[in-house]
Amino acid sequence: GTVYVFLLLLAFGIFTDISNACSEQMDDEDSYEVEKRGNACIEVCLQHTGNPAECDKPCDK
């Protein structure tokens, strides 16, 4: 019985590690996407206004 519980905990621990690693990677990709979008927004905004200060607010910087 004890060995079974141990294996169960071990498997659960490995699964948790894997899912944590995956979700961390997803978070990184999400923030990278947001960063890219923000930069693109500022570039477009600058083309229209030429004023970086005006671009910070609408682009969430």
UniProtKB/Swiss-Prot annotation:
Signal sequence coordinates: 1-21
Localization of this protein: Secreted
Keywords for this protein: Cleavage on pair of basic residues, Disulfide bond, Ion channel impairing toxin, Neurotoxin, Potassium channel impairing toxin, Secreted, Signal, Toxin, Voltage-gated potassium channel impairing toxin
Top-level lineage group: Eukaryota
SS bond list: C41-C59, C45-C55
Record's GO cellular component terms: extracellular region
Gene Ontology molecular function, alphabetical: potassium channel regulator activity; toxin activity
Record propeptide residues: 22-35
Tissues expressing the protein: Expressed by the venom gland.
Family the UniProt entry places it in: Belongs to the short scorpion toxin superfamily. Potassium channel inhibitor kappa-KTx family. Kappa-KTx 2 subfamily.
Function per UniProt: Voltage-gated potassium channel inhibitor (Kv) that acts on Kv1.3/KCNA3 and Kv7.1/KCNQ1. 1 uM of the toxin inhibits Kv1.3/KCNA3 currents by 35.1%, whereas 10 uM of the toxin inhibits Kv7.1/KCNQ1 currents by 44.9%.
Miscellaneous remark of the record: Negative results: does not show activity on ion channels KCa2.3/KCNN3, TRPV1, and KCa1.1/KCNMA1.
Domain comment (free text): Has the structural arrangement of two alpha-helices stabilized by disulfide bonds (CSalpha/alpha 2(S-S)).
Protein name, per record: Potassium channel toxin kappa-KTx 2.8
Organism from which the protein derives: Heterometrus petersii
Classification lineage: Eukaryota, Metazoa, Ecdysozoa, Arthropoda, Chelicerata
